[in-house]
Each structure stands twice: as C-alpha cells, then as structure tokens.
Amino acid sequence: MSAIVAANSPRVGFVSLGCPKALVDSERILTQLRVEGYEIVGGYEEADVVVVNTCAFIEAAQAESLDAIGEALDENGKVVVTGCLGTKGDLIRETHPGVLAITGPQDYEAVMAAVHAQCPPPARDAFTGLLPASGVKLTPRHYAYLKISEGCNHHCTFCIIPQLRGRLVSRPVDQVLAEAERLVGDGVRELLVISQDTSAYGVDTRYAAAEWRGVPRRTRMTELADALAELGVWVRLHYVYPYPHVDELIPLMAEGRIAPYLDMPLQHASPRILKAMRRPAGGEAVLERIRRWRQRCPDLTLRSTFIVGFPGETEDDFQVLLEFLEAAELDRVGCFTYSPVEGAAANALADPVPEAIAEQRQARLMALQAEISARRLARRVGTECTVLLDAVDGDAAVGRSQLEAPEVDGVIHLRGAEGCAPGQWVPARLEDADEHDLYGRVL
C-alpha cells in the first residue's frame, strides 16, 4: 500500500496494481483525495475506506486483483474497487459481494463519489491542502510517468485493453507539455512517456495543433518529443509500435535531444503468428528498420516483449522468433507465456499450446536473450556515461544511464558515490558487466 502522511482527517488506504498507465490513474485519484483533505494511510486497520485500483490484462492479473480486494475486505471491510477489473462488475460482486462500489478505469468522479459516501471530505484547510504543482506521485521524485493518451485502436486477438479502456483518445499536446513542465519544476529529471500506443498519438485528433511557449505544436509523437526535449531532462519513449514514422525520432536521439531508447512490444516474429495476433509489421520489415535506426544512432537501445505458446504456435514458428532475436540483437527483452483472457478473440483459436511446452519455450528464449544482452552490455565496458542515481548507500550507489528504464531494465552499480544523493546526475566509467547489470565508478 502507498503511504503518504497528512494532517488529521478522514483516512483512505490505497492499493495500486497493474501497469504504469494504471499507476498514473492512481496518482490522479490520490491527488484529488489530498486536494479534498483526505489523509492517505499505509495500513488497512487505520483507514476509514480502502480504494483498490485493479488490473485485468491477463488472468493472473485478475486473480491478483481479486486477492487484493479480498485482503482489503478481510482487514478493513470498506472497499471501493476501480480500474480495469472494474469493467467486470459481475465477477467482482460474485467473488466479493461486500465491496462498497465498483467503477471502471479513468472514472475518477465515481471513485470520489464512493469515497464521499463512506466518509465525507473534511472542511478545507488552506495549508494542509497545499500540494506540489504536479500532484501526488507514486514514483521517486526524480522520475515520473507522463501519460499522453488513453485507449487503443488495435484489435490484437490476445488483448482486451480496447474493451477495458476504449478507443484511442489523445490528450491535447499543450496539456501534456504543461504537465511535463510542472513535473520538471517539481524536481523530475526523467520523463517516461507512456500510453497504450505512443506512436499513434494524435491520430484521433488529426494531429490538431495547440500553442505552447508561444509556438504552435501538433498533437503528434515526433513534435511532442521535440518539445519535451526543450525541458532539459531525459525523455524516454515506451509502448512504441514500429510504424514508418518512428524513423523521425531517430535523429532526435542521435542529436542527444531525447534518450536513445525505444520500448517496442513486438510480441512475435513469425508472420503466421503475427497474423493470428492481428499485429502490425513482420519480422523482416522490423529487422530492416532496426538496421537503419542503428546506422543513424549507434547508441540506440531497444527493449521489447514477446508472447510464446500462442494458440497454433509450432516449433517452426518459435524458431523464427529465436532467429529474429539473434538477428535483431535487442538489448532488453521480456517474455510471457500466452494466457487466455475472458473476452479475447484468441480464445477461439485452434491448437492451444500445452502449458509445459510454452514454459519450455519461454525458458529457451530467455536463455538466448541472456547471451545477447550480455554481449550488448559487454560492448559498453570501458566507456563513460552520465548516470541518474536511484539509491545511494555510503560509497555505493545504484542508478541508470539513458539506456536503462526504471523497474524493467538492469541497473548500473557504482562505487565512489560518497556525498551523492538520489536524483543526482553523475559522470561514471563502466568497468564490468553481466547479462543484466553494469558496474563502474563515479568519476
């Protein structure tokens, strides 16, 4: 649970589950709670009501969310459910009939109404209501997620996100940039741009323009990245599909304006499986694009995720994926076994892959990727880079360069960090590496 100490007032416990997009939703709810004078507490027993922000992306996430709701009911008894699992109200009521209220994702007003019904907001205090301009954040002070859109226009057969969060709705570019400016003003040094499909940003608005800092800016990924670069902090892009217009970002990376880093959820490389998944692009086209990108920006770091054991996946399909990984030499990879989700079109596909085989393929893929990641990291030994410190303990520190995202990638372990502090940029020399992390010293 998230703990934020405030003045004496009605107390709300909060559980945030799921992806960074859901984390941003939690931050928005927490900010509104604090603005209205509620105290956010870290224990169930001291809360007047508990809000659980849930996930429903895969069955395991649904089970975790139901368990969290049950724990909150057992420990407190007064629970408001929100988030993606909130779209499955019948399931929640059947499993936990005692919940006070259920709302879907982004339904902030309904969450607040449910909290008000259980414990009305206190009289406002001009001093206890003060918050940083950027509101309540659940990340360390030096980095923050910047959500630029909601929903998705894709119809991937394994995914129900469009059912949960709707079609693509892009935030106006001036609002996104104003939020980014507030975050930087509050000490953020790294902006992690997120959405369900970052590369589709602005499609729904026909790339409408809005003014920021006296200059018209279009609601489009490249223009947004270019404007964010003016803030003088690291800008990292996540959830980017490899569309042709992504090519426009590479010069910004090569020039050092934004982090030379792309998080692309490719999911597979076999044309047959990609077609069954209804995913854009094929392995060969992506390989050619990666070659061009690295030619223009040699420091480019690529992260992706893949699904193995998708219905109908044969050993030949899996070999195509392994060959793609060898050729692409991606820096960081996550791999999941296929998990059926209620409402997903893939549930109707023939030839399900036995769980044992899917798990074997996952292990084989990750073993291969460990070798690839080790080779990629070894090439950085002997170089110097700027590291953003996440934690400091005496002489030792842990941080990341522009080539490592928080929470999902490896880290850089440093010596010689006396007097340094989290959130500080330091120059470092890299001296060793393994398949996940780098090791070095502060210069």
Swiss-Prot record:
Its EC number is 2.8.4.4. Keywords: 4Fe-4S, Cytoplasm, Iron, Iron-sulfur, Metal-binding, S-adenosyl-L-methionine, Transferase. One of its GO terms (biological process) is tRNA modification. Its main location: cytoplasm. Residues 378-443 form the TRAM domain. It catalyses: L-aspartate(89)-[ribosomal protein uS12]-hydrogen + (sulfur carrier)-SH + AH2 + 2 S-adenosyl-L-methionine = 3-methylsulfanyl-L-aspartate(89)-[ribosomal protein uS12]-hydrogen + (sulfur carrier)-H + 5'-deoxyadenosine + L-methionine + A + S-adenosyl-L-homocysteine + 2 H(+). Pfam families: Radical_SAM (PF04055), TRAM_2 (PF18693), UPF0004 (PF00919). Residues 138-375 form the Radical SAM core domain. [4Fe-4S] cluster 2 binds at C152, C156, C159. Binds 2 [4Fe-4S] clusters. One cluster is coordinated with 3 cysteines and an exchangeable S-adenosyl-L-methionine. It is an enzyme of class 2 (transferase). Its cofactor is [4Fe-4S] cluster. It is found in: Cytoplasm. GO terms for cellular component: cytosol. Residues 10-120 form the MTTase N-terminal domain. InterPro entries: Elp3/MiaA/NifB-like_rSAM, Methylthiotransferase, Methylthiotransferase_CS, Methylthiotransferase_N, Methylthiotransferase_N_sf, NA-bd_OB-fold, Ribosomal_uS12_MeSTrfase_RimO, rSAM. [4Fe-4S] cluster 1 binds at C19, C55, C84. SUPFAM superfamilies: Radical SAM enzymes (SSF102114). One of its GO terms (molecular function) is aspartic acid methylthiotransferase activity. Catalyzes the methylthiolation of an aspartic acid residue of ribosomal protein uS12. NCBIfam families: 30S ribosomal protein S12 methylthiotransferase RimO, MiaB/RimO family radical SAM methylthiotransferase. Belongs to the methylthiotransferase family. RimO subfamily. This is Ribosomal protein uS12 methylthiotransferase RimO. It comes from Alkalilimnicola ehrlichii (strain ATCC BAA-1101 / DSM 17681 / MLHE-1).
